[in-house]
């Protein structure tokens, strides 16, 4: 459980329902979220959006954009619940805000799984100093 908390802090600062996000990533990829994605590329972890290094890094870029588009939500404080049913993430909220947050987190976890072939261990701990700003809009 401690590893999931550390992962969440690294992956998104303190945004979102961090325990659930960590569980989703592990369930979809089988990877330890903290050590595999916590500081990956230019977009995973704290900081703004930068030019993605690869498809895995783009998952984090899109996730940050997803959070940015949330309405009437506080991704830092709000929490949500979800279920793992037949190897699929099911967001279980009726309230729009937690459901939207859950859908953002579900999308990044699935994106990581779909792009496991682009995952590069050399980008696991990337110094953000060498990341370029992007003109790409969310």
Swiss-Prot record:
Q: Look up the signal peptide feature and give its range.
A: 1-16
Please list the GO biological process terms of this entry.
arachidonate secretion; lipid catabolic process; negative regulation of T cell proliferation; phospholipid metabolic process
Q: Which residues are connected by disulfide bridges in this protein? A: 42-131, 44-60, 59-111, 65-138, 66-104, 73-97, 91-102
Compartment(s):
Secreted
Protein family (similarity comment): Belongs to the phospholipase A2 family. Group II subfamily. K49 sub-subfamily.
Q: Which domain of life is it from?
A: Eukaryota
What are the start and end residues of every segment in region (Important for membrane-damaging activities in eukaryotes and bacteria)? 121-133
Q: Where does this protein come from, organism-wise?
A: Trimeresurus stejnegeri (Chinese green tree viper)
Q: Which UniProt keywords apply?
A: Blood coagulation cascade inhibiting toxin, Disulfide bond, Hemostasis impairing toxin, Myotoxin, Secreted, Signal, Toxin
Question: What is the documented function of this protein?
Answer: Snake venom phospholipase A2 homolog that lacks catalytic activity. It shows myotoxic and weak anticoagulant activities and induces local edema a few hours after injection (5-10 ug) in the hind paw. A model of myotoxic mechanism has been proposed: an apo Lys49-PLA2 is activated by the entrance of a hydrophobic molecule (e.g. fatty acid) at the hydrophobic channel of the protein leading to a reorientation of a monomer.
Write down the position(s) of the site called Hydrophobic membrane-disruption site (MDiS).
127, 130
The name on file for this protein is Basic phospholipase A2 homolog Ts-K49c
């Amino acid at each position: 459980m401690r590893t999931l908390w550390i992962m969440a802090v690294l992956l998104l600062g303190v945004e979102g329902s961090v325990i659930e996000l960590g569980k989703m990533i592990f369930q979809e990829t089988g990877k330890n979220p903290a050590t595999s994605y916590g500081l990956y590329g230019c977009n995973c972890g704290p900081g703004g959006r930068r030019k993605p290094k690869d498809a895995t890094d783009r998952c984090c870029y899109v996730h940050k954009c997803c959070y940015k588009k949330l309405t009437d939500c506080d991704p830092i404080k709000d929490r949500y619940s979800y279920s793992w049913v037949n190897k699929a993430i099911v967001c279980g909220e009726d309230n729009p805000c937690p459901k939207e947050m859950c859908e953002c987190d579900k999308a990044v976890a699935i994106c990581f799984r779909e792009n496991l072939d682009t995952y590069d261990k050399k980008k696991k701990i990337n110094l953000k100093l060498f990341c370029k700003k992007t003109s790409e809009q969310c």
